[in-house]
Amino acid sequence: LKLLTDALQKRPRETPLQLVHLSSCGVYGNRHGALTDESVRLDSLHPVNEVLAMAEDMIQSLRSESVNVCIFRLGGIYGPGRDIPAMLLSAAGGVVQRNGQNVPCWIHLEDVVRAVSFAFEHNLNDTYNLVNDTQFTGQELTDRLCEQAGLPLAKWFTIDTTDRVLNARVSNEKLKQIGFTFTRPSIVG
Protein backbone atom coordinates (compact mmCIF):
# COMPACT_ATOMS: atom_id res chain seq x y z
CA LEU A 1 0.00 0.00 0.00
CA LYS A 2 2.90 2.34 0.75
CA LEU A 3 4.30 1.86 -2.78
CA LEU A 4 0.88 2.57 -4.27
CA THR A 5 0.39 5.78 -2.27
CA ASP A 6 3.93 6.92 -3.14
CA ALA A 7 3.30 6.32 -6.86
CA LEU A 8 -0.05 8.11 -6.78
CA GLN A 9 1.48 11.11 -5.02
CA LYS A 10 4.00 11.45 -7.86
CA ARG A 11 1.41 11.36 -10.67
CA PRO A 12 0.61 14.50 -12.71
CA ARG A 13 -1.81 16.68 -10.73
CA GLU A 14 -3.72 17.96 -13.77
CA THR A 15 -5.66 14.73 -14.23
CA PRO A 16 -8.51 14.25 -11.74
CA LEU A 17 -8.52 10.93 -9.94
CA GLN A 18 -11.23 9.08 -8.01
CA LEU A 19 -10.04 6.50 -5.48
CA VAL A 20 -12.33 4.03 -3.75
CA HIS A 21 -10.94 2.04 -0.83
CA LEU A 22 -12.86 -0.89 0.65
CA SER A 23 -12.28 -1.20 4.39
CA SER A 24 -14.24 -2.96 7.12
CA CYS A 25 -16.78 -1.98 9.76
CA GLY A 26 -14.74 -4.26 11.97
CA VAL A 27 -12.59 -1.19 12.68
CA TYR A 28 -15.29 -0.09 15.15
CA GLY A 29 -14.63 -3.11 17.38
CA ASN A 30 -16.80 -3.84 20.38
CA ARG A 31 -19.11 -0.87 20.89
CA HIS A 32 -21.45 -3.02 23.02
CA GLY A 33 -24.20 -2.79 20.39
CA ALA A 34 -24.27 1.02 20.36
CA LEU A 35 -25.41 2.95 17.29
CA THR A 36 -22.23 3.75 15.39
CA ASP A 37 -21.60 6.18 12.55
CA GLU A 38 -18.50 7.27 10.64
CA SER A 39 -17.54 9.86 13.29
CA VAL A 40 -16.85 7.22 15.96
CA ARG A 41 -13.22 6.71 16.97
CA LEU A 42 -11.77 3.52 15.50
CA ASP A 43 -10.74 0.61 17.70
CA SER A 44 -7.00 0.11 17.35
CA LEU A 45 -6.69 -2.40 20.19
CA HIS A 46 -6.78 -5.39 17.84
CA PRO A 47 -3.83 -5.65 15.40
CA VAL A 48 -6.13 -6.21 12.39
CA ASN A 49 -8.07 -3.03 13.20
CA GLU A 50 -4.80 -1.15 13.61
CA VAL A 51 -3.67 -2.24 10.12
CA LEU A 52 -7.05 -1.32 8.60
CA ALA A 53 -6.98 2.12 10.26
CA MET A 54 -3.41 2.73 9.01
CA ALA A 55 -4.48 1.74 5.48
CA GLU A 56 -7.39 4.20 5.65
CA ASP A 57 -5.02 6.95 6.84
CA MET A 58 -2.56 6.24 4.00
CA ILE A 59 -5.31 6.37 1.38
CA GLN A 60 -6.77 9.55 2.90
CA SER A 61 -3.34 11.20 2.75
CA LEU A 62 -3.75 11.20 -1.05
CA ARG A 63 -6.81 13.47 -0.91
CA SER A 64 -6.20 16.76 -2.73
CA GLU A 65 -7.88 19.16 -5.14
CA SER A 66 -7.37 16.65 -7.95
CA VAL A 67 -7.85 13.43 -5.94
CA ASN A 68 -11.14 12.37 -4.41
CA VAL A 69 -10.89 9.58 -1.84
CA CYS A 70 -13.93 7.53 -0.95
CA ILE A 71 -13.62 4.97 1.82
CA PHE A 72 -16.35 2.39 2.27
CA ARG A 73 -16.41 0.48 5.55
CA LEU A 74 -18.10 -2.77 4.61
CA GLY A 75 -20.16 -5.16 6.66
CA GLY A 76 -19.80 -8.90 6.20
CA ILE A 77 -20.38 -9.66 2.54
CA TYR A 78 -23.05 -12.14 1.53
CA GLY A 79 -24.40 -13.18 -1.84
CA PRO A 80 -23.44 -15.67 -4.55
CA GLY A 81 -20.95 -18.16 -3.12
CA ARG A 82 -21.43 -16.81 0.41
CA ASP A 83 -24.93 -17.66 1.57
CA ILE A 84 -24.90 -16.34 5.15
CA PRO A 85 -28.61 -17.09 5.78
CA ALA A 86 -28.03 -20.75 4.82
CA MET A 87 -24.98 -20.91 7.10
CA LEU A 88 -27.02 -19.48 9.98
CA LEU A 89 -29.92 -21.84 9.28
CA SER A 90 -27.53 -24.78 9.55
CA ALA A 91 -27.49 -24.05 13.31
CA ALA A 92 -31.25 -24.72 13.60
CA GLY A 93 -31.99 -27.00 16.55
CA GLY A 94 -28.31 -27.20 17.45
CA VAL A 95 -25.99 -25.51 19.90
CA VAL A 96 -23.94 -22.50 18.83
CA GLN A 97 -20.86 -21.88 20.94
CA ARG A 98 -20.50 -18.19 20.23
CA ASN A 99 -21.71 -14.93 21.66
CA GLY A 100 -25.12 -14.47 20.09
CA GLN A 101 -25.48 -11.02 21.65
CA ASN A 102 -22.94 -9.32 19.37
CA VAL A 103 -24.40 -7.16 16.60
CA PRO A 104 -22.68 -7.83 13.27
CA CYS A 105 -23.44 -5.89 10.09
CA TRP A 106 -24.02 -7.16 6.57
CA ILE A 107 -23.90 -6.06 2.94
CA HIS A 108 -24.90 -7.91 -0.22
CA LEU A 109 -22.22 -8.23 -2.90
CA GLU A 110 -24.53 -6.59 -5.44
CA ASP A 111 -24.75 -3.46 -3.25
CA VAL A 112 -20.95 -3.35 -2.89
CA VAL A 113 -20.60 -3.28 -6.68
CA ARG A 114 -23.34 -0.67 -7.02
CA ALA A 115 -21.80 1.53 -4.30
CA VAL A 116 -18.39 1.54 -5.98
CA SER A 117 -20.06 2.63 -9.24
CA PHE A 118 -22.02 5.25 -7.30
CA ALA A 119 -18.76 6.60 -5.82
CA PHE A 120 -17.28 7.08 -9.30
CA GLU A 121 -20.49 8.56 -10.75
CA HIS A 122 -20.83 11.08 -7.90
CA ASN A 123 -17.13 11.79 -7.20
CA LEU A 124 -17.47 10.82 -3.55
CA ASN A 125 -14.82 12.26 -1.28
CA ASP A 126 -15.58 11.00 2.22
CA THR A 127 -15.93 7.90 4.41
CA TYR A 128 -19.18 5.90 4.41
CA ASN A 129 -20.48 2.80 6.15
CA LEU A 130 -21.56 0.35 3.48
CA VAL A 131 -23.95 -1.89 5.42
CA ASN A 132 -27.58 -2.81 4.95
CA ASP A 133 -30.37 -1.99 7.41
CA THR A 134 -30.16 -5.27 9.39
CA GLN A 135 -29.21 -4.49 12.99
CA PHE A 136 -29.99 -7.71 14.86
CA THR A 137 -27.75 -9.59 17.24
CA GLY A 138 -26.43 -12.84 15.82
CA GLN A 139 -28.98 -14.75 17.90
CA GLU A 140 -31.89 -12.51 16.84
CA LEU A 141 -30.96 -12.90 13.18
CA THR A 142 -30.62 -16.67 13.43
CA ASP A 143 -33.91 -16.93 15.36
CA ARG A 144 -35.72 -14.86 12.72
CA LEU A 145 -34.37 -16.94 9.86
CA CYS A 146 -35.27 -20.20 11.67
CA GLU A 147 -38.79 -18.94 12.40
CA GLN A 148 -39.30 -17.93 8.75
CA ALA A 149 -38.14 -21.37 7.62
CA GLY A 150 -40.23 -23.19 10.25
CA LEU A 151 -37.12 -24.68 11.86
CA PRO A 152 -36.32 -25.10 15.57
CA LEU A 153 -34.29 -22.30 17.13
CA ALA A 154 -30.62 -22.75 17.90
CA LYS A 155 -29.46 -22.74 21.50
CA TRP A 156 -26.69 -20.27 22.18
CA PHE A 157 -23.87 -21.00 24.59
CA THR A 158 -21.92 -17.80 25.08
CA ILE A 159 -18.20 -18.22 25.49
CA ASP A 160 -15.77 -15.40 26.14
CA THR A 161 -13.21 -14.94 23.43
CA THR A 162 -10.28 -12.66 22.71
CA ASP A 163 -11.00 -12.84 18.97
CA ARG A 164 -11.58 -9.67 16.99
CA VAL A 165 -15.25 -8.81 17.25
CA LEU A 166 -17.63 -6.27 15.78
CA ASN A 167 -20.48 -5.46 18.13
CA ALA A 168 -22.07 -2.27 16.83
CA ARG A 169 -25.32 -1.16 15.25
CA VAL A 170 -23.58 0.45 12.28
CA SER A 171 -25.52 3.27 10.63
CA ASN A 172 -25.77 3.65 6.85
CA GLU A 173 -27.66 6.98 7.04
CA LYS A 174 -24.80 9.11 5.70
CA LEU A 175 -24.69 7.07 2.49
CA LYS A 176 -28.48 7.11 2.12
CA GLN A 177 -28.54 10.90 2.61
CA ILE A 178 -26.49 11.39 -0.56
CA GLY A 179 -28.91 9.27 -2.60
CA PHE A 180 -27.62 5.71 -2.49
CA THR A 181 -30.35 3.08 -2.30
CA PHE A 182 -29.82 -0.55 -1.39
CA THR A 183 -31.14 -3.32 -3.62
CA ARG A 184 -30.87 -5.66 -0.62
CA PRO A 185 -31.72 -3.53 2.44
CA SER A 186 -31.91 -6.59 4.71
CA ILE A 187 -30.33 -10.02 4.98
CA VAL A 188 -33.71 -11.29 6.25
CA GLY A 189 -36.45 -12.10 3.73
Residue ranges and their predicted role:
Residues 27, 77-79, 112:
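Conserved sequence/active-site signature of Rossmann-fold short-chain dehydrogenase/reductase
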Residues 60-104:
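NAD(P)-dependent short-chain dehydrogenase/reductase
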Residues 5-47:
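Conserved Rossmann-fold NAD(P)-dependent oxidoreductase catalytic core, especially the SDR/UDP-sugar
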Residues 86-95, 101-128:
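Alpha-helical substrate-binding/gating segment
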Residues 32-71:
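Catalytic helix-loop patch of NAD(P)-dependent Rossmann-fold dehydrogenases
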Residues 20-23, 73-75, 131:
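Active-site beta-alpha turn of Rossmann-fold NAD(P)-dependent dehydrogenases/reductases
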Residues 186-189:
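Amphipathic terminal alpha-helices
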